[in-house]
Amino acid sequence: MSLFPVIVVFGLSFPPIFFKLLLSLAIFWLVRRMLVPTGIYDFVWHPALFNTALYCCLFYLISRLFV
């Protein structure tokens, strides 16, 4: 459980995990933008699966960081 309260923006309530998801998505975009020019995707068998695993790992790290 998170200690952060539910955040209300313009009458819409958002759970704390929503902001963790958005933060991990922003970091995922940055990491992906850095990995594409390096050519690492040439060695990846399934890029969509790699992207999903990368996002899941980033989300796990962020959620462990803000517990």
From Swiss-Prot:
<keyword id="KW-0472">Membrane</keyword>
<protein>
    <recommendedName>
        <fullName>Protein AaeX</fullName>
    </recommendedName>
</protein>
<dbReference type="GO" id="GO:0005886">
    <property type="term" value="C:plasma membrane"/>
</dbReference>
<feature type="transmembrane region" description="Helical">
    <location>
        <begin position="43"/>
        <end position="63"/>
    </location>
</feature>
<feature type="transmembrane region" description="Helical">
    <location>
        <begin position="3"/>
        <end position="23"/>
    </location>
</feature>
<comment type="similarity">
    <text>Belongs to the AaeX family.</text>
</comment>
<dbReference type="Pfam" id="PF07869">
    <property type="entry name" value="DUF1656"/>
</dbReference>
<keyword id="KW-0812">Transmembrane</keyword>
<dbReference type="InterPro" id="IPR012451">
    <property type="entry name" value="DUF1656"/>
</dbReference>
<keyword id="KW-1133">Transmembrane helix</keyword>
<keyword id="KW-1003">Cell membrane</keyword>
